[in-house]
Amino acid sequence: DAQSLTYPCFCSRKDIQAAASAPHGNTGVYPGTCKSLSASDIIVAARQKSPAIRLRAAAAIQSEVGDFVIVRSDQLFAYQLAVTVDDLDQGVTEVIRGADLVDSTPKQVYLAQLLQPNRRKIDYLHATLMLDDQGQRMSKRDGSVSAIKWRQGGGSAEQLLAHLAFTAGILGVSKPINIVELIEMVDIHLISSKLSSIY
């Protein structure tokens, strides 16, 4: 039942970081501080602040992801739950996304199994992130060149595709290519070894 799978958590990010930095702490994994609170402890804590709701992770993934938030303390659904429900609702069977989201995958796989245990498993592939000349992740917030700026600077769509495909290891040389040519030559099974991971 849902109550045995979840519990309220009153920990702040600061509390969790402090626990993770303690000797023998597991960085990034919730230490379970609120997991065994009694009913009276929960009532007292709830008078001070609204709790988040954590899902008890299965033993197989406990050390990897720990118990994770599915409802935030502001009562909004957390990303992990929202995206999993959305994927299931849309009938998604394959997801290709950046390697920066690989830590979310076991959580979403676990949630999907709980919500729809007889459904076909979603396959995940995590693509290598695009890096700039200094080896830093390309992102708009860090001022990386956008596609619009690329075009304004005289770059063509074919040159941009070539640059991205070359950076990802799909092309051996960075020579202009159009989208139709690129689609025809891309086989996910052949390039999967150049991508970060398949889950």
Which ranges hold each PLM region?
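Non-catalytic terminal extensions that flank enzyme cores
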Residues: 43-44, 136-138, 146-199
